Amino acid sequence: MKFFASCAKGLEYLLADELLALGASKATATISGVNVEGELRDAQRAVLWSRLASRVLWPLSEFDCPDEDALYAGVAELPWDAHLSVGHTLSVDAHVSGTAITHARYAAQRIKDAVVDTMRRQGLERPSVDVESPDLRLNLSLRKGRATISVDLGGGPLHRRGWRMAQNEAPLKENLAAAVLMRGGWPRAYADGGGLLDPMCGSGTLLIEGALMAADVAPGLQRYGSDLPSRWRGFDRNGWQQLVSEARERDSVGRAALKQVIHGSDMDPHAIRAAKENAQVAGVAEAIWFGVCEVGELQTPPQATGVVVCNPPYDERLAADAALYRRLGDTLQCAVPQWRASLLCGNAELAYATGLRAGKKYQLFNGAIECALIVCDPIAVPRRTPLAAPTALSEGAQMVANRLRKNLQKFKKWRAREGVECFRAYDADLPEYSAAIDVYQQADGDRRIFLHVQEYAAPATIPEADVRRRLNELLAAAREVFEVPAERVALKSRERGKGGSKYGRFEQRNEIVHVREHGALLRVNLFDYLDTGLFLDHRPLRGTMAQQSRGRRFLNLFCYTGVASVEAAVAGAASTTSVDLSGTYLQWCADNLALNGLAGSKHKLVQADALAWLEAERAHFDVIFCDPPTFSNSARAEDFDIQRAHVRLLRAAVARLAPGGVLYFSNNFRRFKLDEEGVAEFAQCEDISPSTIDPDFERHARIHRAWRLTA
């Protein structure tokens, strides 16, 4: 069985590891959560023990939902008497995107109506609504026409541990605090005899969470006490009581052995008073020392090593905050130089202001605020580039840097909303700096940034010296803005009329980087070939197809490295078939599938000429993707010209559609003209090109065209 654990953006990989450690069969990180394979007991264990999850959602039903009537009908089909007891209360949380239903509250109301009407028709008492503390809390996820109705097994946000009685302004959520501690290596440091220090502790969230973690206290134990998290009729009450009994035994042993190695201070006496009250309620007051002092007066703890955790304040007064962050960095280097630090900073600029060299950087979200988490190990290692002496950029390079920063700000909300980690940051925005800059963020390890720079051929009238200078200025600007060394910048040249050079090898690095898109892990090679293995412009189309492929058969023609197949499979496709003439690309596709644990008979790879294969094949598919090359002259198949052959190709593909199936056809030939009359003989065809272009490709929206065909 599959269920979903949601979390704050940036915690997905940590949460996946945590759920696997708790016993889940499989955990796959996706946007703002993790898809989990396991039994109901695994989900209930996550409710009790997960320090990172926001909610644990157990699915009841999933169905196509093009409009509000379909939503009502899909909910009304469920046997609500098997889920909700007479006299119990109900609440619905809804999340909608990319659908005809645009208001979450309205969607939630339609679900309540469907539940109430269904129970009335069965002659049962109408359930009441209780928004604060319902017996059954339902969750709707409605995305791109697909609805999932789930039970919120935890009954609400899991970050509420039950110990927070007093708080300072803008407290840090407990699950985000747990992430800061885990990234900083606190569990291992405590086991090795190290200490924990927060010099700006506020109401004590980081320290209390750290103490409970060290004492092996289940996060849900105090939250629920003797109550059940949910009164859903399918909840395994006996299994829950067994989990709670085991947790209480571990709690008793862990608290008795808890060492007094945790130290917190703050310049605000009211904050320290709140921290002490919270620690008392949490039962860890004896394990934490609290004191009132300014950050510059910090005393060195008795432990030789340990972890500094801190969430320094940040607001609109960047200059004042930068001075505070600099003082924090200076103090830590003097007081605890051999300790590790895990600092949750307001943004990358404030992180830089500490003067500390970050061995690792992570992007996290504190509510809606994008934050930079830096991990320094040890604190004493100086940063290579002094804060006061950044590399000076030329006037031209500064123009490029300014444009890059402007674009990053422009894309910020969109990237956060859609979970985009690989994107085009610049596309010849300044004509004299004619290149494209693509950003690839590593999905594993320390989440490093790589840049893929494609230099466009300059007109012959421009002197070669000017071309070289401008390229060097562009590269200097990109390296500064993204803070990447030269060895993580791949430079390519795209030129016309160079015979077979377009697909030749560039370097012999054989360096594979794992990236993530739509929840799928993908292998890219940024250095060795002109193309990387991932066409970023097709991102929205791949997302649409993945959503529509759940429980359906997906066919990928001219599959290249199989990214669309992998994303469809990760989204829950019943099967995928990937066809390409290149054995190299099919092996790449196989590697991508294996990377996501998807290798097997459900995912078929076919080495063949796609057109010939279509005309001989008899199987049918529900979703087909056809993205052919403009030209192909392989020795193993007849020459292919998309303009000349597209009607024949599309006719053969439409013939393989199952009833109700859909074919997506795309190509990047700028002079391509669809034979509308020819296609109309066998299919209905709609140009959907505008909807397949994300904000990072809007400057050159003709990078591809796309059509939706149905029989």
Swiss-Prot record:
EC number in record: 2.1.1.173, 2.1.1.264
Record's keyword annotation contains Cell inner membrane: no
Listed CDD domains: AdoMet_MTases, THUMP_AdoMetMT
Annotated GO MF terms: 23S rRNA (guanine(2445)-N(2))-methyltransferase activity; RNA binding; rRNA (guanine-N7-)-methyltransferase activity
PROSITE patterns: THUMP, UPF0020
Domain of life: Bacteria
Catalytic activity: guanosine(2445) in 23S rRNA + S-adenosyl-L-methionine = N(2)-methylguanosine(2445) in 23S rRNA + S-adenosyl-L-homocysteine + H(+); guanosine(2069) in 23S rRNA + S-adenosyl-L-methionine = N(2)-methylguanosine(2069) in 23S rRNA + S-adenosyl-L-homocysteine + H(+)
Keywords: Cytoplasm, Methyltransferase, RNA-binding, rRNA processing, S-adenosyl-L-methionine, Transferase
Residue ranges that the Swiss-Prot or TrEMBL entry lists as coiled coil: none
Xref: InterPro entries: 23SrRNA_methyltr_KL, DNA_methylase_N6_adenine_CS, RlmKL-like_Mtase, RlmKL-like_Mtase_CS, RlmL_1st, SAM-dep_methyl-trfase, SAM-dependent_MTases_sf, THUMP_dom
GO cellular component, one term: cytoplasm
Domain (THUMP): residue spans on this chain: 42-153
Subcellular location: Cytoplasm
The family this protein is said to belong to: Belongs to the methyltransferase superfamily. RlmKL family.
Purpose of the protein: Specifically methylates the guanine in position 2445 (m2G2445) and the guanine in position 2069 (m7G2069) of 23S rRNA.
Protein name per Swiss-Prot or TrEMBL: Ribosomal RNA large subunit methyltransferase K/L
Organism: Xanthomonas oryzae pv. oryzae (strain KACC10331 / KXO85)
